[in-house]
Amino acid sequence: MLAVLRPSLADLNPDRMWPVYRRYHLLIVSQRDDEHNGALTTAVVDVLSRHLPASRPQLVSAADARRIGVLIATNQQDVAIMQADSAEALFLARPPFADIHEAPLRIIVSFGSHVFVCRPDFMARHAYLLAQTLTAHAEGLPAAATAPSGVVPAHRGAQAFFAGEEIPDD
């Protein structure tokens, strides 16, 4: 009987629908062990649900910053909210991310102590719209969304928004 159960337990994507679901929903990864992160991510999902409903945002949670880093670096997730220090450590391969070299990481917006991060291959048009929506509706957020700064580069779509350029067409 164990042999029968084993394949279904080992396969985390048994029906192969997870990539399809990710394509049609913006899954924003939150950090379970950071209370402020959870509140911020919940507010971001709420603002996007009301003002950018086509994004179909949903909160998903990871145990800690390390898990978020692994999910982003291995292309299992596209966007997350992390502490700014953790995002910098991931980008620079510093502990607890010392084994994750050249992590593909960009910032869409900064919330002060936290940042909304994504992979560089995240569509520029989508990053632009997220930055635009979150900065325009700061009243719904515990901290205002501002232009990225620091070691981790801004995503090119967010950079275009904050530079006052046209929305990218990718």
Regions found by a protein language model. Give the residues of each.
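A bilobed periplasmic-binding-protein/Venus flytrap-type ligand-binding module shared by bacterial periplasmic
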Residues: 107-126
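A ligand-binding cleft/hinge motif common to bilobed small-molecule-binding domains
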Residues: 74-99
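Short beta-strand->loop
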Residues: 94-110
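Short helix-initiation/N-cap motifs at beta->coil->alpha
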Residues: 53-70, 154
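Short, polar/charged alpha-helical segment
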Residues: 15, 37-53
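N-terminal export leaders
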Residues: 1-2
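Short, well-ordered beta-strand elements
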Residues: 22-37, 57-61, 162
